């Protein structure tokens, strides 16, 4: 068996095309375009790349894009003050603060300062709580994008044994909640997990997000399993690889995401979807 590749790039482009059409329809109906504020603190090269991609995607679909590039010496109070301004700005539907932040700024305080109805990253405790209670509104972008990828395969998730490797607040934990909502029997693995190999071998659906190249050997993948690789790791030769040993895993899996071109583009597509959702559900005038 050779796995079918889930083309995240093509699916994300399709979503962006649909969003562009919706923005055009909004303008024709006399409504304003959705607005996204993107805040970057410091000059982390990876963060600069991510932020650049998000801003370009915004402009491509016709959103208003506000950019705030702050020095790494920016104080926590200055950042919170900027968030307050964006919270009050009626042209802004979504606020994104690129993580990680410099060490002197407390991430949880920043995330909680963003109004829940403008939290298009889906990190605010209110939005995570909504997902936990099975009434999601603004959902975490990477898990949301992954669910779109899974749906694209046509695989029925109800009753599947799903395994999430990695328990971060950004991917692993909300991903486990999304899979529960999709009817999976879900196990979350982390650094204290014992018998990881045994758990992977039993899983019908595996999502790996640990940030370690080739962390899951391909031969561990159960024949016919669906594999979602969230990892993006740059090797010394400059090539990008995922957290799963792709070549061997692709011989066992029924569907697999490539790296690059799998999950990455979907995260940005989901961010755009959330921004339009916030505009329509929360901020449009009745």
UniProtKB/Swiss-Prot annotation:
UniProt: NADP(+) binding residues: 166-168, 232
Key word NADP present: yes
Keywords from the UniProt entry: Amino-acid biosynthesis, Histidine biosynthesis, Hydrolase, Methionine biosynthesis, Multifunctional enzyme, NADP, One-carbon metabolism, Oxidoreductase, Purine biosynthesis
Pathway: One-carbon metabolism; tetrahydrofolate interconversion
Catalytically driven reaction(s): (6R)-5,10-methylene-5,6,7,8-tetrahydrofolate + NADP(+) = (6R)-5,10-methenyltetrahydrofolate + NADPH; (6R)-5,10-methenyltetrahydrofolate + H2O = (6R)-10-formyltetrahydrofolate + H(+)
Pfam families to which the protein is assigned, alphabetical: THF_DHG_CYH (PF00763), THF_DHG_CYH_C (PF02882)
Cystines in this chain: none
EC numbers on record: 1.5.1.5, 3.5.4.9
A Gene Ontology biological process term: L-histidine biosynthetic process
Single GO term (MF): methylenetetrahydrofolate dehydrogenase (NADP+) activity
Annotated InterPro entries: Aminoacid_DH-like_N_sf, NAD(P)-bd_dom_sf, THF_DH/CycHdrlase, THF_DH/CycHdrlase_cat_dom, THF_DH/CycHdrlase_CS, THF_DH/CycHdrlase_NAD-bd_dom
GO cellular component, one term: cytosol
Subunit structure: Homodimer.
Family statement: Belongs to the tetrahydrofolate dehydrogenase/cyclohydrolase family.
Function comment: Catalyzes the oxidation of 5,10-methylenetetrahydrofolate to 5,10-methenyltetrahydrofolate and then the hydrolysis of 5,10-methenyltetrahydrofolate to 10-formyltetrahydrofolate.
Name this protein carries in UniProt: Bifunctional protein FolD
Gene: folD
């Amino acid at each position: 068996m050779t796995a079918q590749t889930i083309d995240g790039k093509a699916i994300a482009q399709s979503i962006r095309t649909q969003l562009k059409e919706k923005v055009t329809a909004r303008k024709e109906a006399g409504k304003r375009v959705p607005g996204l504020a993107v805040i970057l603190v410091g000059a982390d090269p990876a963060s600069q790349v991510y932020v650049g991609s998000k801003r370009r995607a915004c402009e491509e679909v016709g959103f208003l894009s506000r950019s705030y590039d702050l020095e790494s010496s920016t104080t926590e109070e200055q950042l919170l003050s900027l968030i307050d301004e964006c919270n009050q700005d009626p042209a802004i539907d979504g606020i994104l603060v690129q993580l990680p932040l410099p060490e002197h700024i407390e991430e949880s305080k920043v995330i909680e300062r963003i109004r829940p109805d403008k939290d298009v990253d889906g990190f605010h405790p209110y939005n995570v709580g909504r997902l936990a209670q099975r009434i999601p509104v603004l959902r975490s972008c990477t898990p949301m994008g992954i669910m779109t990828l899974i749906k694209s395969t046509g695989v029925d998730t109800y009753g599947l044994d799903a395994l999430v490797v990695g328990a971060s607040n950004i991917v692993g934990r909300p991903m486990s909640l999304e899979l529960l909502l999709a009817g999976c029997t879900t196990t979350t693995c982390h650094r204290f997990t014992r018998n990881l190999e045994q758990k992977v071998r039993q899983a019908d659906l595996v999502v790996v997000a640990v940030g370690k190249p080739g962390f899951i050997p391909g031969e561990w993948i159960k024949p016919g399993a669906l594999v979602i690789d969230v990892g993006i790791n740059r090797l010394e030769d400059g090539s990008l690889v995922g957290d799963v040993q792709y070549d061997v895993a692709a011989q066992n899996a029924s569907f697999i995401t490539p790296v690059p071109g799998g999950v990455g583009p979907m995260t940005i597509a989901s961010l755009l979807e959330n921004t339009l959702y916030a505009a329509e559900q929360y901020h449009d005038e009745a």
